[in-house]
A protein has these predicted regions:
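Conserved, mostly hydrophobic/aromatic
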Residues: 25, 44, 55, 122
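Active-site-adjacent beta->alpha loops and helix N-cap segments on the catalytic face
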Residues: 2-15, 34, 58-70, 77-90, ...
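Conserved beta-strand positions in the central sheet of alpha/beta enzyme cores
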Residues: 24, 50-53, 131, 157
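Active-site mouth loops of central-metabolism enzymes
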Residues: 23-37, 101-114, 157
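Glycine/proline-rich, positively charged
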Residues: 103-119, 123-134
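Structural motif
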Residues: 46-47, 125
Length: 157
């Protein structure tokens, strides 16, 4: 069972009460460049998105289609890092305190960064949830990441 954060719970409860659907959007962090990528996130927020999924750029984004893979590569070429992605999330949180923010990425970026450090930093940035596309459930690594995220009330989806 996925336990959502208070912000995500509130978003879904409000939508359910109004019998409305959620608008959940996606962008690749730092694409086409860091500044423009943040402006895209702000425009998405202004357009009525309830939750925004911010992709952590990865060289081998195998779970994504070819267009998103190319955007990942372009972002990395332009110098996007996990720290910069977290900074973008933080700026987006400051811009819209009500927006649900979810980081989506691959486990080796998180392991290289450090699971505890990652959980703490994204908590400070105001991230609500993490989707780790290549992390199997019920393995040691999933339990370790989930435990660190729960400590900071961040959902692992």
């Amino acid at each position: 069972m996925i336990v959502l954060t208070n912000r995500l719970d509130k978003i879904f409860q409000n939508l359910k009460a109004k019998n409305e659907k959620a608008l959940i959007t996606f962008s690749v962090s730092g694409y086409p460049d860091e500044e423009t990528g943040l402006e895209i996130c702000k425009a998405i927020s202004d357009s009525g998105a309830h939750i925004h999924e911010l992709n952590i750029a990865h060289e081998e984004a195998q779970a994504d289609g070819p267009i998103i893979q190319l955007a990942n590569i372009e972002s990395i070429k332009n110098g996007i890092t996990l720290d910069k992605t977290i900074n973008i999330a933080s700026k987006l949180r400051a811009y819209n305190p009500e927006l649900g923010i979810c980081l989506m990425g691959y486990i080796n970026n998180i392991f290289i960064y450090g699971i505890e450090k990652f959980a703490k930093k994204i908590s400070e940035a105001g991230v609500d949830a993490v989707i780790c596309v290549d992390l199997p459930t019920d393995v040691k690594e999933e339990k370790e990441l989930n435990s660190a995220l729960k400590k900071y009330e961040i959902a692992l989806i």
